Amino acid sequence: MSQQVVIFDTTLRDGEQALQASLSVKEKLQIALALERMGVDVMEVGFPVSSPGDFESVQTIARTIKNSRVCALARCVEKDIDVAAESLKVAEAFRIHTFIATSPMHIATKLRSTLDEVIERAVYMIKRARHYTDDVEFSCEDAGRTPIADLARVVEAAINAGAKTINIPDTVGYTMPFEFSNIITGLYERVPNIDQAIISVHTHDDLGLAVGNAIAAVHAGARQVEGAMNGIGERAGNCSLEEVIMAIKVRKDIMNVQTRINHNEIWRTSQTVSQICNMPIPANKAIVGTGAFAHSSGIHQDGVLKNRENYEIMTPESIGLNQVQLNLTSRSGRAAVKHRMEEMGYKETDYNMDHLYDAFLKLADKKGQVFDYDLEAIAFINKQQEEPEHFRMDYFSVQSGSSDIATASVKLACGDEIKAEAANGNGPVDAIYQAINRVTGYDVELVKYDLSAKGHGKDALGQVDIVVTYNGRRFHGVGLATDIVESSAKAMVHVLNNIWRAAEVEKELQRKAQNKENNKETV
């Protein structure tokens, strides 16, 4: 049996389903590139048949990613399979992941079918997918509640049909680790052709057992683990990939398996996902939480000072967290800033040096000293906002005092036109949002406002993340500045640009669809 565990990331498919606002194509690509740097073997990046936007995202990522295999999800439906293949065909190599429910409950109440019909349908769809690629994965949805004899029948038929990877999902997070281990062992005992496929697992955290179930399955012989960075996903989330990866590395003495992951990229990838998805990482989160390597007890602190291994089973450096932070000033040149970015693991292609250095100088003039966390924050924000902007803040002013009423004046560039407005609001942030909305004419509703500090002390940068609804859809915006009102204004301008870009994308997709129809009529 292979000692290599395939890491299958579903942050951009199962993980994204849990987000309050959908990600843009650019944001998804940014996460995909981070996952590629980290070395995931397979990344599932969308469900192409679900929407034209998802199709475009999958296609864009498939065209860009070279070192990880790109995968798309499809139900056991002909159209799903065909659309998935169409979105992926620009990739050098790709995988189609198809699935159908196998538990008695799902078959009877959801599918209104029989096990024999489910097997027949699965076999047909796997063969259809094989017309497009040799790399087909099949999932037995709700496998955790499927009798082992039924599960073995489905798995054997799927392998005979050509599936190279068989995924065993604990879809509702119901199974206990010892049960999940027995399921994997049972399949190895009952399925005669099981050596012709890789057995995969996909676990959910409804009972807090997703990682435990994944580790138990690997110990029992599974050789692919599916999950998401930071454990994001439906309901209570997916299996946290960073936890499984580090468990395999730290406990190699009993696991006897390995992954191809670049462990030095774990921290950075986790932060990228957290920031783009607007999902803060709990301080006590294993591996990547801010408290994961903190020691507050006097006894523990004394022990760590004498020997870190007394209370640390891994080091911050083992996940790419460099705790030595160099401060820069406004006198630091471009070379010094570039060198520091390289030391933190960034390549020149990860950021625009001109934009980064300009933002660095402005921040250094305000703060005096700029630290690593400042550089990372402005690099992230610049990456988020480097797309063409229709709206740009030219000027703003807010007047407020001890009363609830504040007055804001704003001047915005709207395309080639400069517009100005003023408005009152319940506090400075509300006032500036009212003024911005008057300028743009967008009737947006603020549904979430988060403020977080990037750095320490009174000079910390303030990052504002907002979620708004517009025409029934949710959009995310982010702003960063030393002033909270300025951060808030930047976040609103960013979200309005995202709304504008989404509308432009929809227009382009409609234009392409119309051209396609016109070409059909001509033929």
UniProtKB/Swiss-Prot annotation:
SUPFAM superfamilies: 2-isopropylmalate synthase LeuA, allosteric (dimerisation) domain, Aldolase. Residues 392-523 are annotated as: Regulatory domain. Its EC number is 2.3.3.13. It is found in: Cytoplasm. The keyword Amino-acid biosynthesis applies. InterPro entries: 2-IPM_HCS-like (IPR050073), 2-isopropylmalate_synth_dimer (IPR013709), AIPM/Hcit_synth_CS (IPR002034), Aldolase_TIM (IPR013785), LeuA/HCS_post-cat (IPR054691), LeuA_allosteric_dom_sf (IPR036230), LeuA_bact_synth (IPR005671), PYR_CT (IPR000891). Catalyzes the condensation of the acetyl group of acetyl-CoA with 3-methyl-2-oxobutanoate (2-ketoisovalerate) to form 3-carboxy-3-hydroxy-4-methylpentanoate (2-isopropylmalate). Homodimer. This is 2-isopropylmalate synthase.
